[in-house]
Amino acid sequence: MSEPSRDPRMQFLIDRLLPGTVRRVRVTGFDGEDVLVRLLDAVGEEGETARIPRHEASTRSTAHPAELFEVGQEIEAEEIGRWHEDRLLLSARACENPALRSFLLALEPGDVVAGTVAGVHDFGVFVHLDGEPDGLCTGFIRVPDLTWDRIAHPSEVVETGRRITAEVIIAETRSGQVAISLKALREDPLVRFADQVGRTLTGPIVRVVPFGVFVRLAPEVVGFLHLSELAAGETAESPEQLVGEGESIAVEVTEVDPRRHRVRLSAARRAGAP
């Protein structure tokens, strides 16, 4: 199940990283560490001048692209944009491994894929996707795409060796990676929680930050209570002066925003309060 709407910033990035047209080019020289090329037409005649930035030359580590390419050599490269003066930019690394490129191009955003967790790190999770070329690890899950819940570390959700099913966000030919999402296959819990606005709930404080606290209201649902609400007339410079992590607190749900995945809270009114 896909998310009802994607963050516009993420969609902009996805649009920029979608595979471009592959062009046949001839290496004409080097400008610093960039590779200069000319486009070739169907009969091999040279056309527009283009540039392959150093970081788009190869996935292999070399001191200079001259170790990879020779002047006069013909290669394939993917269009990635335009440089100043409208010069065409290309990526040779996107075409470096034909088997990998074929695998990536067969995947579309929204496809459901399966794989095995290869590594769990504080910045995300690497996944061996079924069908990927031997010797590669193409799947990657960012921390925000693991779960709707707030977590301290990805190991709370997955472990190395676990089989998973996830949704493709984008298969990126330049990095050779497939960005995938576990949480996209699950309904946003805030969709069903939206009818709780105005209700008073009690839950444990799961995180304390300088400007307030996060309170667990239901499985995978956490709301934020600002320090000004928490203090309720008391003088406090930080939440730690008033409450601690794990402490239960009564709050009123004032806003549920599924688009931003945000729940705002206020202090629960005492009986008889105006």
How should each PLM-predicted stretch be described?
Residues 1-274:
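Single-stranded RNA-binding regions, centering on S1/OB-family and related RNA-binding modules
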